Amino acid sequence: TLAAEFGKHPAVQLWHLSNEYSGDCFCPLCQQAFRDWLRVRYGSLEALNHAWWSHFWSHTITDWSQIDPRDSSVDGMRLDWLRFVTHQTVDFMRAEIAALREGG
């Protein structure tokens, strides 16, 4: 493969991993991954509601299953969704980098 042949070549400074990342996936797996990410980030629904200021807009979350990233009416959720998508993209790129380094 290209990685095996050129992965550790001293003249290679950069490697274009992939491109054209776009669009949001709201499948059940991605929605659950988002909820899990939020649990790690906030630790509790109380902390999440405080951070999102959800009580002000009468959007208080009482169960993790109520979190639906397709709902753009809660600004804090939309911002965290964008953070989550960025985290997932970076995680994907790190996996590609690791594969290239192993093959190189």
List each language-model region with its residue ranges.
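Polysaccharide-binding and catalytic clefts of secreted carbohydrate-active enzymes
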Residues: T1-G104
